Amino acid sequence: MSRPPDSEGEPIEDKSQLIEDLESGCTPRENWRIGTEHEKFPFRLSDHKRLPYEGPDGISEILSRLTRFGWQPVKERDNTIALSLEGCAITLEPGGQFELSGAPLETIHQTCDEVHTHLAQVKEVGEELGIGMLLSLIHI
């Protein structure tokens, strides 16, 4: 929650003052970036059930195997709860889904490459463990 401003400021008396105030908060065009969020729910191909955190085909095993691609584990106590790599993160969401939070990139082509690389990595690990992924959201 943000705190109230220290002062009430001066009343806006002219349209140009409002425009100037709004423009002061704009990011310069050369600093614009695109970020991707991509969620997927892992499930066992054998019985279509959701995965537990622990176990030979659990969420922790998926996260552990993704480290071979350079992802660094983020731990809470002894449990890996996320991975990070070059401005990206793979986080474990409350419903058991994985979310790729992509790096801030300059072009849509870079985000496309990032998502395709991520999906190839997840597919490789999933095939080893007999796990599929149900995609739930892509937001660019």
Predicted ranges, named:
Residues 2-28:
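Short, Gly/Pro- and small/polar-rich lid/capping loops
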Residues 29-32, 36-41, 63-109:
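Polyanion/phosphate-binding surface patch
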Residues 138-140:
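Conserved small/polar residues in nucleotide/adenosyl-binding loops
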Residues 112-118:
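"Short basic amphipathic alpha-helical interaction patches in structured regions
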